[in-house]
């Protein structure tokens, strides 16, 4: 007989209930903002990304869409700067929300 685990288990294929995709995406962007505020960490790509993130008067893309669209760049950036907390959160977002 399987034992019940008190740990949180989510399954996006059953329901997005109890998965805070928007909040997790916002937290990951906070990690990105902290890293990019350190001199020497921004690149031409991240400057371009900041413009996309700001959006236009007509529309502003949401954080989850931007993460999903640039997931490999996020992974490479956080690996480069050894941000294990951001990498863990990125993996969680990828598995639960993308």
From Swiss-Prot:
Alphabetical UniProt keywords: Nitrogen fixation
Listed name of the protein: N(2)-fixation sustaining protein CowN
Family, similarity comment: Belongs to the CowN family.
Transmembrane annotation, as ranges: none
Pfam family, any one: CowN
Function: Is required to sustain N(2)-dependent growth in the presence of low levels of carbon monoxide (CO). Probably acts by protecting the N(2) fixation ability of the nitrogenase complex, which is inactivated in the presence of CO.
Entries under HAMAP family matching the protein: CowN
GO biological process terms on file: nitrogen fixation
S-S pairs: none
Annotated gene: cowN
């Amino acid at each position: 007989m399987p034992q019940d685990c008190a740990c949180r288990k989510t399954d996006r294929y059953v329901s997005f209930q109890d998965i805070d995709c928007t909040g997790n995406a916002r937290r990951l962007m906070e990690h990105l903002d902290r890293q990019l505020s350190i001199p020497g960490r921004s690149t031409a790509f991240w400057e371009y990304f900041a413009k996309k993130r700001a959006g236009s008067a007509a529309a502003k893309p949401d954080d989850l869409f931007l993460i999903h669209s640039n997931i490999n760049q996020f992974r490479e950036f956080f690996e480069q700067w050894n941000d294990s907390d951001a990498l863990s959160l990125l993996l969680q977002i990828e598995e639960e929300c993308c």
